[in-house]
Amino acid sequence: MRAYKLKDIISQGTKDLFYIWWQELKAVVKDQGVLIFFILVPLGYPLLYTFIYTNETVREVPAAVVDNNRSSLSREYLRLVDAGADLEIVSHCSDMEEAKTLLKNGKVYGIIYIPESFSRDITKGVQTHVTIYCDMSGMLYYKAMLTANTNASLMMNKQIKIERSGNTTIRQDEVSTSPIAYEDISIFNPQNGFASFLIPAVLILIIQQTLLLGVGLSAGTARENNRFRDLIPMSRHYHGTLRIVLGKSLTYLMIYAVMATYMLCLVPKMFSLVQIAQAGTLAAFMFPYILACIFFAMTCSIFIHHREACMMIYVFTSVPLLFISGISWPGTAIPKFWEVISWLFPSTFGINGFVRINNMGATLTDVLTEYRILWIQTGVYFLTTCIVYRRQITLSRRHVYERLKEIKKRRR
């Protein structure tokens, strides 16, 4: 008899689980706001973000020149600067005020200032200086200015050394100017591009943030549609905590299994980004990450009482989370307090693990720390979800019982 009852309980629980899954799926499909966060944003936002950085690096950044020397050496230096792909000299100004005006008006993004003593110092064998001013509103402009001028100064230094060395052969010139030969090889990001560096981290963050927004919006809708503003409806199918948590999470898992495949596999391929991950490794790593994000979002949704609240609470966190993940800003430079805060979010370990798997060809063994922590987060947030949903079931029952008591009193 006991086994029979247990069998009935399991059977009824399974039926309720799939009933809740189906109801949640219908709620997602019928809610345009949730569809936007679950479908439209994951489909469109990666494309938009990648299109913005599709050129990887900036080329031919316009620059102004103030040449107070006007010698053959200063003109040669400027030719070397202009010959590269990074910078384009668009204006020769008579003084700094004219150059500053161009910079303020946005016609140039940098100024190259050559002092009057430029050629005289070189002739005397005294170190001379070239000053560059850059619009620091864009770090890529600064990078282009610095790279172009550094390369030009190094090349000019070589020419000056050759002229003064008195060597008799080309080989002697090579040895005197470059005694140690080196080769600069960019690994994992051969283009030295911004998209290859930033987009993988953004794709992982989109999964977490859209889940937070979508699940939060769905929770706000459920409360607004409930007579007592409860998250859990009073229904015989919604009596068990596990069936509710697993039923809802199964809906989100099915949706994001498809969305994650699109974002992490198709989008990088469409834009020829670095992608050397093994399919099995990537799938094994993403499974706990998506689960951790789902249960994290379900736990946080308990604080959402209105549909619009999730927009005000979660949207602004995207940029800070990207910074404290240790990708766009060095992890060693992050204050310890914010580093500890970042451990609460699945995106921190998801981003670091995915970048190493996707861009560096790492295996699960190489990202074992991140992989284990994601499973720990999955377990912890699953427990917190069960706790808060159990609390909601209790509140829902209490509100219904209180309402029944009021009705009985009125009838008396």
Region annotations inferred by a language model:
Residues 1-196, 366, 391, 397-412:
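Extracytoplasmic/periplasmic domains immediately adjacent to an N-terminal transmembrane anchor
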Residues 14, 18-22, 196, 237-250, ...:
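Alpha-helical membrane-protein architecture signal
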Residues 28-35, 206, 247-253, 257, ...:
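Loop-to-transmembrane-helix entry motif
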Residues 38-39, 196-197, 316-317, 342:
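Hydrophobic alpha-helical transmembrane segments of integral membrane proteins
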Residues 44-47, 185-267:
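Hydrophobic alpha-helical transmembrane segments of multi-pass membrane transport proteins
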Residues 48-49, 70, 91, 101, ...:
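Membrane-spanning alpha-helical segments of multipass transporters and channels
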Residues 170-181, 227, 344-357:
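Peri-membrane helix termini and adjoining interfacial loops of integral membrane proteins
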